[in-house]
Amino acid sequence: MNPPNSTCELGRQGEALAATYLQNEGYQILERNYRFRHNEIDLIALDGSTLCFVEVKARLSNKAGSPLDAVTVAKQREIIRAAQAYLTFSGQECDCRFDVIGVNVHAMHEARISSFTIEHIKDAFWVEQ
């Protein structure tokens, strides 16, 4: 397996694969890499009338566990802050959820992901009231 030149490149490839997966599942991608201050949401998509804030984790090995394990409480807070900003600035009022997509990479060819599986965890975490 020829790994990509950086973890950022692996992340970009993983996000592109996750976006394609969501589109194939009928989601509409609204934003990629939405930033608010130092916080980022990888993908913002509509699943019917539900707005989904999606964190993508690409991994070269499944030894590290579930992608959900990589989304710490601190990372969840960052995503929630960015989501709140997005809702404020977009003026959208709708049902929302927070998903995590894991892209488990099985093979690479010339630093490109060539074989992978997707793990999609809907409602992976919630906003504490």
Curated annotation (Swiss-Prot):
Protein name as catalogued: UPF0102 protein Cag_1992
InterPro entries: Restrct_endonuc-II-like, tRNA_endonuc-like_dom_sf, UPF0102_YraN-like
Domain of life from the UniProt record: Bacteria
Family: Belongs to the UPF0102 family.
Organism: Chlorobium chlorochromatii (strain CaD3)
Taxonomic lineage from the root: Bacteria, Pseudomonadati, Chlorobiota, Chlorobiia, Chlorobiales
Gene Ontology molecular-function annotations: nucleic acid binding
